[in-house]
Every structure is written in structure tokens, then in C-alpha cells.
């Protein structure tokens, strides 16, 4: 009986152990599954996070790459523009005396060295921007060629071999007038082809009836009133022309440097002549400015060329900016009807063939065609 009881107990214990073992297995299985799901979820989140981080890195890298390329292109464009600007012909007062030893005959093109800066300054932000030196060198060469071609086109446009700058300053549009005893604004306005209100506004004058002796006023360059030249008989005119031609003959075959600068320029010859007549030279940044930069009120009369106009001995002729590289040209008329058809005239010129700036071309006779835009200045006084 005891043995049977023990056997039953053993069987029951064994069954209970199996049940506990099964419960333990189930628990372990559930725990394993939970841990596995947790780990899988964590890895998924980590992978997702890594993808986001990588995406951010990619976006940031893309933006940095685009920024670097933009900076590089900007620097290249800046360098190119800078080279083009620096490649322009430099206009300075001393460039008229360039070391150019070859004389240029009338009608030939002007050759001039063009200095191009090929050491541009590049700047970069940070250490991540790398500039390709080969590409930059290529850009510099392209810019150099473009600058040379641009300036060569400007050279080809010159229709005359008179040496001068390619860019030039316009003649001033106003001059300073000093108020004298008895002056009124209305009289000054009439004299300088303007209005009282214009002078008031230009000079900040509140009361047009109140100006002072010695007061400086800005007025237009060209005056309105031009005194009529004295009428002379044909005999006196012939004698005057003879005396003028005799004086001009003394200027021929000699070089004249009135201002001591830039050699024997055309302006120098004319200034020597005008100084002989009136005791002073003429103003003007270039020869073409002479009719506008001077007050010829009591010294000369200005004529614009027409089909019937005939220049007289002693007249100044002023060529437009189409000549002299933009500065014009000037000479003294010797014969106003050289061909008998009013198509040509003869004048005394200096530096017409571009040799005066190095003192290789003296004053000499030249025959010119009458040009539509020529201006002639006839002095009241004869030499």
C-alpha cells in the first residue's frame, strides 16, 4: 500500500514538474519573442535614424557643394570682369608720350600696347573651397583675348592717324563769371544765352536784384552776343591776308611746344599763333573743345562749315572727335579754296602724321577736304 502511494506521488510530482517545465518554456519563449521584437524595433529605429542622418549629411554635402561651386563661379566671373576692366586702355596724361618709336603715316591704323593684368586676386570662404588653377588660367587667357579684341576694334574705328586717347573727358558746360560794376543778372543772362532764373537756380540766388561786385557766378560756356567784325575794304583785306601769311611762314618748318608737354602737338602751333594775336593761348581738354571752352566774344567769330563756306588765311580749323582718337585736330588755314571748287583747303599743321609727340614732325603744309562737321574760327585781328 505504501509503495503504491509513493508511486502515485512520484507520478503526480512528475506531471507537476512537466507542467512547470512547460510553463517555464512558454515564459522563456514569450520573453525571447519580446526581446527579439524589442531588438528588431530598436534596430529598425536606428536604421531609420541612420537613414535620416545620412539624408541630412547628403543634403548638407549637396548644399556645401553647390555653395562651393557658386563661390567658385562668382570668383571666376569677378576675376574675369576685373581682368576686363584692368585690360582697358589706361588713359593718363603721360600716355601721350608712350615709347612708340615708329611714325605712322596718314590713314594707317594706330598701334598701341595694351596692358592686361593677369594676376587676379581670388578670395575663398573657409578651407573647403578649392580653385582649379588650370581653369582659372584658362579664364584669364580668354579675358585677355576679349580685352585685346575689344581694344583692337576701337583702334580700327580711328579714321585719322593723329595720336590720342580712346576715351576722353567732355568739355565743361559752365564757366565762372566774376560780377563787375554795373552788371545785372538780366544782362549776364543775355550775354551768355541763358535766363535769369537759370542763373538764380544754378548759383542759389534768392533775390535776382541783389548781386555783388566780385561775386563768382556759374554761367554757360558759349555767350550769346558776338560783336560784329569790322568791315574792311578789299585792299585792306588783301594786305591783312598777306601780313598773316607772312607771319605764318615764320612758323613753318619748325617745331612748337607752347605748354612744354607732349612734344609738338597741333594745339601748340595754334596756341603760338593765338598768343601772337591776343597775348594768351586757348583752353580745351582736346582740340575739338576749342570752340566751346573759350570766350571768343571780342576776339573771333565762329563759323560752321557749309557747302558755300570759304575759309580765309589765318582762320583756325577745328576737326571733330572723329579725328585724333577722339580729341580732334586743329590747324591754321593758308588757302581756303585750294582746288578752286571749295572742296579742299590748305593749312599749316603740326602732328598731323603723329610725329609731333616725339618731336619728329615740324609744322608743315597739308591739304584737307572740307568736312561737314568742321568748325572755323576767324580772328578779328590779323597777324
Swiss-Prot record:
Keywords, ordered alphabetically: Cell wall biogenesis/degradation, Hydrolase, Secreted, Signal
Stated EC number for the protein is: 3.-.-.-
Listed PROSITE patterns? CHAP, LYSM
What Gene Ontology cellular component terms go with this record? extracellular region
Give every Peptidase C51 domain span.
241-378
Where does this protein reside within or beyond the cell? Secreted
* Residue span, LysM domain: 175-219
Quick one: signal sequence residues?
1-49
Q: What is its main location?
A: secreted
The molecule here is called Probable cell wall hydrolase LytN
